[in-house]
Amino acid sequence: MNITRILGVVTTVVILYSVQVTAQFFGDVQQAMRCVAKLMPCQPYIHLSIPPPPLCCNPMKQIAEKDVSCLCTAFKHPDLLRFLALTKENAIKILDSCGINHDPSVCNKTNPSSPAALPEAATSGNSFSTKKNTALAITFFGFSFVFLGMII
């Protein structure tokens, strides 16, 4: 009976850990997808020499001014950018074509979602902390159940 309980606890711990890691990974990818979706109106203007229209530039301005972490997250997932036939360099070129000032070094900071690394306006609406808190809550409740299972 003891070995069954130990195996049950170990299995539960492994499952909870994998759920936590998956939640953190997919949270990051979801934010990158959200940002890449905002870049889609700019796709036809990637290789053209004419300036992009407001349909492209307005979402880009919003990202650059209020959600820099979104752009940085998209830059960390080049496969998602390739979906639009876009590279980091092309995205920066579009920002320049729209007359948007963007400092690429902001994304080189250790944690681009931290308030110290971003301008104050860029931290509003940041969903990284919510996703991390969700993963921690899953872990806390999961380990509570494991502990309760060991007692019973």
UniProtKB/Swiss-Prot annotation:
SUPFAM superfamilies: Bifunctional inhibitor/lipid-transfer protein/seed storage 2S albumin. Gene3D superfamilies: Plant lipid-transfer and hydrophobic proteins. The keyword Amino-acid biosynthesis does not apply. It comes from the Eukaryota. Keywords: Cell membrane, Disulfide bond, Glycoprotein, GPI-anchor, Lipoprotein, Membrane, Signal. A lipid is attached at S124 (GPI-anchor amidated serine). Glycans are attached at N108. One of its GO terms (cellular component) is side of membrane. It is a lipid-anchor; GPI-anchor. It holds the Pfam family LTP_2. It is found in: Cell membrane. Disulfide bonds join C42-C56, C57-C98, C70-C107. Residues 1-23 form the signal peptide. Residues 125-152 form a propeptide. Probable lipid transfer protein. Belongs to the plant LTP family. This is Non-specific lipid transfer protein GPI-anchored 8. It comes from Arabidopsis thaliana. The lineage of its organism: Eukaryota, Viridiplantae, Streptophyta, Embryophyta, Tracheophyta. The gene is LTPG8.
